Amino acid sequence: MSDLGQARRSTLLDAAWRTAYRVGFPLARIWWRLRHQQHEGALVAVYVGQALLLVRSSYRIEWNFPGGTVRQGETPEEAARRELAEEIGLAGAFPLVAVGDAWGLWDGRRDKVHFFELRLDRLPELQLDNREIIAARLISPSELQGMALTGPVAVYLGRTIPPGCHSE
């Protein structure tokens, strides 16, 4: 399991953004719990052969798929494509396949997550933003065991579904 190359060197501004994410994320989780916040997101499982691409955010320890919030007026697929471009620099007319949805209570909010799959013969050079996304790795199925993963990724992979969560 090795880190995939980053596109550019980290700057002082990048470090400030990472600090803002690390401070802001726990505060946002408290806010979501207090407001009983609902959220809709889209995540993309990127496969290169049997390996799966996972990304690490600057503000959490778990690994995740590229993806994020579905904005108002945006379809889940549009959100998935936008997030791929923003987080890892992957843009283009590649075939995203919708593979299902999951609902759960993650990070203190009720979350509906739309899952997509993208299958590639080879991984193009990734352009990590060095602010929100700080690492990306291709992981073999055997390496997934014991890794810290976000709740939605664990559900996608068929791990034990926590109480209050379900998938379709």
Question: Language model features by range: what are they?
Answer:
Residues 4, 61-62, 130-168:
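Nudix hydrolase/Nudix homology domain
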Residues 49-51, 119-124, 141-143:
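Short loop segments at secondary-structure junctions
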Residues 36, 44-45, 106-107, 125-130:
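Short secondary-structure boundary/capping segments
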Residues 42, 47-86:
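Conserved Nudix-box catalytic region and its N-terminal flanking loop in Nudix hydrolases
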Residues 102-125, 137, 160:
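Active-site-adjacent beta-strand/loop module that shapes the phosphate/pyrophosphate-binding cleft
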Residues 2-43:
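Acidic, metal-coordinating catalytic segment for phosphate/diphosphate chemistry
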Residues 91-101:
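A short coil-to-beta-strand element that immediately follows conserved catalytic motifs
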